[in-house]
Amino acid sequence: MSGKASRNKPQKKSRKKSRLNCMRPLTGVLAAGLSFSTLAAAQSKEYPKYFTGPQSNGSWVVSDGAVITPAGTQVDLGIRVRAKAIALNPTAKSHTAAVLTLGATQAVEIFDTNTGNVLQNYVTFGTDSSGSYSGIAYSANGQYLVFSQDSSNVTIAKVNAQGLLEDDAQVFVAPNNSFIACFPNSPPASYGNPCGSFYSGYTSYPGGVALSKDGSSAYALLNQNNTLTQIDLTATPPTQGTQIRVGNAPHSIVIASNGTTAYISNEGGRAATQADFQINSAGTEIVADPFVGAAITGTVSVVDLPTMTVLSTISTGLHPTGMAFYGGNLLVANTYSDTISVIDTATNVVGRTINLALPIGVPGQGPAYGAGPNSIAVDSKNAVAYVALYNANAIAVVDLSPGATNPVLGMIPVAYAPSSVVLDATNNTLLVANDKGIGARLSYECDHGVCGYNTHQDNGTVSIVPVPLPGTLQAMTQQVIYNNHWDLAQNIASASGGNPKTKPVALPAKIGDPSLIKHVFLIVRENRTYDQILGDVAAGNGDPSLAVFGDGSAAGGTPVTPNAHLWVQRFPLLDNFYDPSRQSADGHQWIQEGMAPYADDIQSPDWVRSYPGGNAGDALAYQNKGFLFSEAEAAGLPVKIYGEYIENNTYKQPNGSKKEPSWSEFYADSQCFEGGPDCGPPGTPGETTLYYQNTIRSESSIPAVYNYMVRNFPYFDLNIPDQFRVDLWVQDFNNDLAAGTVPAMEQLWIMDDHTTGPPTPQAEQADNDLAVGRIIDYISHSPIWSSSAIFIEEDDAQNGVDHIDGHRSPGYIISPYVVQNGPTDHTYYTQVNMTRTIEQILGLPPMNQFDLIASPMGTDFVKGTPPADNFLPWTHVPNQIPLSQGVGDNIVDDSKDSPAVKTLRKGWLQKKEEISAGKMHKPDSEDPDTVNHFDWYMSTGFTRPYPGEKTVRPASEFNNPAPAGDGDDD
């Protein structure tokens, strides 16, 4: 094999500047394991006060509230990297291993398995430097390393005697939608997106790889194509060969000892038939649950490699992922079933299923869902498997003996979200790729005396863990229990057993007890950190210098969010509230599902297959336990959904035009409805209905959404001002009040604080602040105020910085039943605590391990009868920044700007138009670093450098928009 055809001299010259081929020692972060005897003696607290990040005892707290105490030695892979998969070099004397990454400038990192030193950050010779979610393997002789790159390449790299990579060839494996079958008359065609929607012409999304015994062929799974492809390694350069259809969304491939039979795990299960209920996933119709829309089949394809023919298809648990052979059996990790399917390879039949259930659960209802097994390493000599549990930050030690009644022997604590595990038999160690490592903590934005953490500063790691002796495994298991707060017995006990005859209180002691709160409103907003909005509130732990959307002290003296600042004067100020998510795609999942399921989370940060965000449209992104709204619906509660999990909008104006009205037209209609003077034709001042109210037609393929959604409320669309959204809601709310039919749960997606719409960032924040303020105003002045609670949260905090952690975000609870005019609440809470609080009030069962162990937000609710003043209504204040600022002729006043500032502003306004053109309807489709700089500069008058930087940078330095069609926000 020669890689010369894939590079040229200029590439080689530039490559030396970006390649780090020298030894790079650990930085000292988590370089050694912690003492379990000290930590395991601790007890989880129901209402902890710690902040995310490093703790005084050497542990770390990550953004979902888990404690991280990884065993063994930790390999620091550097800033902004996700560790996805790991491969051990079979040449023992090299003592090296390779890590496949995402989100970095290199695809692969090579490290020393003895010392943990990173030896090489490898950047490919071709134009594609991306990694992938899975797919890395050495040839049997250790001379080649094959790995997938999610920009439609499979790369074959030469390995030298020291284990370093020297040369490579990239094989382009094109996207091909001819392997997708469509059934136009099958459900849910009547209200979902057409078959083939969301298929990306940008990439085939290569994943799992394997090599033939003789090294003549490589085999790669093309996840979006739903195919297996052969690559001829004897050709110069290597070339793609036969491609065949397997199951939906193939994940991993292993080759049997006979060298001719391959097994492929298919996360999306079998191909759909016309009789199946289907939900789209990246263009493919997935066999789905007819209520919540999640995938309901998982399969393994058996392939004869010489003929490239599928011999049979084996049904497994849900979302089968990692696999490993054990004797005459194949072990398959079922990520969404918390099980391992044991397949007899002689008959290709599942002989038994190993249960990896977590040691917690609602009494009488079985174990809690959500271990997330995804990778398996086998010690055949000792009949033990080591299984990575993505959602437990642990490796399960599993007894493979056929008669084992309690197969899980214990658990080993590793770092955040383990995605791959390999057994190094020579060193008797486990090599574990930790997808999220220690969280997004080591931000480069702490330079120059300013700390500004952001969710995108991923710090994936590798754990090198000595195989534990039986005497140490018990202590490790106890540590895992503590780290995940599975010891919070009071939270588990309060998740059931309620008595409907108990005296009602606002926040019931048990789920099932009655509540005084009959109406829950959940408002979801977009992408802000705590410091951006509330960093200037003296009572909280904020950094005023980062409060660019605050009371005006950091934004030219004009208050941007006056209503939010009034809320936290009367209602609880939560200065330790976190969004576990990195961005919108996993953010809405955390809110609605209490977790971000593996198939969704593992795509981060490239999001090639899909980007569900708050929009529906991907069966693989949903857990089979459903959503917060579907739980309420299943319980028989009336529900209304405004915007969340809606797939698309169509438009039809009263004059018959299908063109979407402009931002200005929507805004003028809103002003007319509200009785303002800015009334354009055809409305008149004081109109009683919105002229464009029936222009919008929203759709969702999820029945649990479609049957409860408000059809004329828009999904994500920055071309629509939030005032128009609120006016639509006001009409609906007034009708429900008059009819006495206000539902038990209303969910509203009010999203213009996302920015990059037509107005300036300050105007969009002001629009959002006013919109939510008006909703609170309407509810508090209504007859149902005395039985209502309003929960407000961001889906994520990605478009800003925070001096504590990039995931810290503003959260609010507005109700007569919360503590008012009280002290700041420093309790550590996350979105999942808010979800659990809603479940506690409405009597909804927890969906998984995360909301099961989450504490209801009891520190914020009044004990006993609230004071009479708590029931007084709250009145919003008007915006102080024109909401149309930046639209049309309403430009920003730059008369006092210097020529240099005017030049900077002009360049950045042009850049904003460039990155947002045609993307108003797609969450996070712009490069976040560019957006964050734009928002910062616009809010600080182009006079303050972005946190961690020395100067105000011109827009010309930002030439990295997200690739077209990949659904990426990076």
Locations of regions flagged by a protein language model:
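N-terminal secretory signal peptides that target proteins for export/translocation
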Residues: 1-22
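Bacterial N-terminal signal peptides
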Residues: 25-37
